[in-house]
A protein has these predicted regions:
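DNA-binding alpha-helical recognition surfaces that contact promoter or target DNA
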Residues: 42, 108, 126
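Short, charged, surface-exposed hinge/linker loops at domain edges
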Residues: 1-5, 46-104, 108-110, 114, ...
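DNA-contacting interfaces and partner/effector-binding or oligomerization modules
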Residues: 1-60, 64
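DNA major-groove recognition helix of helix-turn-helix/homeodomain DNA-binding modules
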Residues: 118-137
Length: 139
């Protein structure tokens, strides 16, 4: 049987990454924020574990796989969150050259001033992957 997977939508709002999950399988909702994506993930995973443990202690009837922590989390970042997290290892200028999206447009996406269409999001992700491949080529 395939492991249960929870899809976690990550956004960048104000100066923080934020995410949440509402699912009957966990018996409610868990929210988290963080200054960095890594901080957000750690906080969310700790909160989810705490939430599930609390529900189990109260006698809530959760699915066995959830109660045992046998599930996967998949984080899906919106475009502002993608671009803000990518600032750790690249610049908008470098990404612009690779993916062919104007730097100013990328800046508008990063601030949330403009919303990127799904095809632009894919171009950004492909550009980030290409930057990673190029970095791996160094020995």
């Amino acid at each position: 049987m395939e492991k249960r997977k929870f899809i976690i939508q990550v956004e960048f709002a104000e100066k923080n990454f934020c995410c949440g999950l509402y699912d009957e399988a966990i018996g409610g909702a868990v929210l988290s924020t963080g200054k960095t994506f890594e901080e957000l993930k750690k906080g969310f995973e700790d909160s989810l574990k705490f939430h599930i443990e609390g529900n189990m202690e109260r006698g809530d009837n959760l699915p066995e796989d959830v109660a045992k922590g046998e599930y996967d989390l998949e984080y899906v970042l919106d475009v502002p969150a993608l671009l803000r997290d990518a600032e750790r290892f690249t610049t908008l200028s470098a990404l612009s050259q690779i993916c062919g999206i104007n730097k100013k447009q990328l800046s508008h996406y990063a601030t949330g001033e403009k919303k990127a269409r799904p095809d632009k999001r894919e171009k950004i992700i492909e550009g980030l992957h290409e930057i990673g491949r190029q970095a791996l080529a160094y020995s």
